[in-house]
UniProtKB/Swiss-Prot annotation:
<dbReference type="GO" id="GO:0006183">
    <property type="term" value="P:GTP biosynthetic process"/>
</dbReference>
<keyword id="KW-0963">Cytoplasm</keyword>
<keyword id="KW-0418">Kinase</keyword>
<keyword id="KW-0547">Nucleotide-binding</keyword>
<dbReference type="InterPro" id="IPR036850">
    <property type="entry name" value="NDK-like_dom_sf"/>
</dbReference>
<dbReference type="InterPro" id="IPR034907">
    <property type="entry name" value="NDK-like_dom"/>
</dbReference>
<dbReference type="GO" id="GO:0005737">
    <property type="term" value="C:cytoplasm"/>
</dbReference>
<keyword id="KW-0808">Transferase</keyword>
<dbReference type="GO" id="GO:0005524">
    <property type="term" value="F:ATP binding"/>
</dbReference>
<feature type="binding site">
    <location>
        <position position="58"/>
    </location>
    <ligand>
        <name>ATP</name>
    </ligand>
</feature>
<feature type="binding site">
    <location>
        <position position="10"/>
    </location>
    <ligand>
        <name>ATP</name>
    </ligand>
</feature>
<keyword id="KW-0479">Metal-binding</keyword>
<dbReference type="InterPro" id="IPR001564">
    <property type="entry name" value="Nucleoside_diP_kinase"/>
</dbReference>
<comment type="subunit">
    <text>Homotetramer.</text>
</comment>
<keyword id="KW-0546">Nucleotide metabolism</keyword>
<dbReference type="InterPro" id="IPR023005">
    <property type="entry name" value="Nucleoside_diP_kinase_AS"/>
</dbReference>
<keyword id="KW-0067">ATP-binding</keyword>
Length: 139
């Protein structure tokens, strides 16, 4: 059954002109891009998006990093899209990521790990709605 998930290509990857290469990996995996936009998050937008981490010690540095440059947000669709994209991203810490994953290939650190992806259907729905309305999605 087709499912949707949310993806962010983070500032470190956008700055290094890796958006196209990462999108190619996503599409080559069989996932379909049904919505996409490039934005520069404000501090308020980043704080809202990562509100679930507000009490974590890394919250401030995460928000600062996510506001440091443009990001590419997209909605991906396909069978079992959430798990498939998480597998393609690789472990949060690129040192632990499997060969051939986005993070093993492109990430520079645990924070500047190039991509974000939803971890469950509930978070995918929240994250998609945070950045996109229904009119911005195709397919």
């Amino acid at each position: 059954m087709a499912e949707r998930t949310f993806s962010i290509i983070k500032p470190d990857a956008v700055e290094r002109n890796l958006s196209g290469a990462i999108l190619k990996m996503i599409q080559d995996s069989g996932l379909k891009v049904v919505a996409m936009k490039m934005i520069h998050l404000t501090r308020s937008q980043a704080e809202g998006f990562y509100a679930v981490h507000r009490e974590r010690p890394f919250f401030d540095s995460l928000v600062t990093y996510m506001c440091s440059g443009p990001v590419v947000c997209s909605v991906l669709e396909g069978d079992n899209a959430i798990q498939r994209y998480r597998d393609l991203m690789g472990a949060t810490n690129p040192a632990n990521a499997a060969e051939g994953t986005i993070r093993k290939t492109y990430a520079v650190s645990i924070e500047a790990n190039s991509v974000h992806g939803s971890d469950a259907p509930e978070t995918a729905a929240y994250e998609i709605a945070y950045f996109f309305n229904a009119l911005e999605m195709v397919g």
